[in-house]
Amino acid sequence: MTMKLEEIYQSFIAQGQAHDPRTMAEITRQLAQEKERYEKLSAEEKQYYDLERLTNPYADTRILAGKSTHKVKTILCGIDVETQDLLLADRLIEKGEKIDLVLAHHPEGQALLGLSDVMNLQEDVLMKQGVPIGLAQGMLSCRISEVKRAFLPYNVQRTINTAQLLKLPFMCVHTPADNQVQWYLENLFAEQAPVTVQDVLDLLRHIPEYQEAMRIGAGPILINGEPSRRTGKIMVD
């Protein structure tokens, strides 16, 4: 199956919204507020505005390099994709491998600078767990500001420039992918109703992806408490 780069991008956004902790009404309201902010900008300010924000609620998910019409059949995926990984992709292509798109989970470039913007989603997650929204916003405001400042001195375009010079289509998908995992685990726990912490660990260890991680010593572990303790309410974050 072959898809255009833009089709893949829009598909990821749609799947992210379908499995978002927020309702579609809440997401639509966010996009409407963004449109209002845009319309209030001066003509000069609009020159520098990221128009993707009007239709994509995930600032950490972007097409970073490549034409939207580029046809994709084979994708090289990675959690963290940086310059060395793009050079590897280019080398594999030289050796005859077919790679139409390099896809990263963690954001790069403009999407990395947008990471702090999607952290407001955590406020909604906490609110759904019973935390008053005012308290949730207060708890997260310092952390969001800290993350935003942390990336300001970064050379965020280095990896993007590499992809452009190598003529490699490059995309990152962060929050939409996280939403899928959160949705899956929340439904798993709701269906299986684990009673103890050990039950939770056992459920996770039956998931193929976690089993693969366990083989390299990176599987689920308990970092606080005892396996015999009751779970009570489970929050997936």
Question: What is each PLM-predicted segment?
Answer:
Residues 1-237:
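Hydrophobic structural segments
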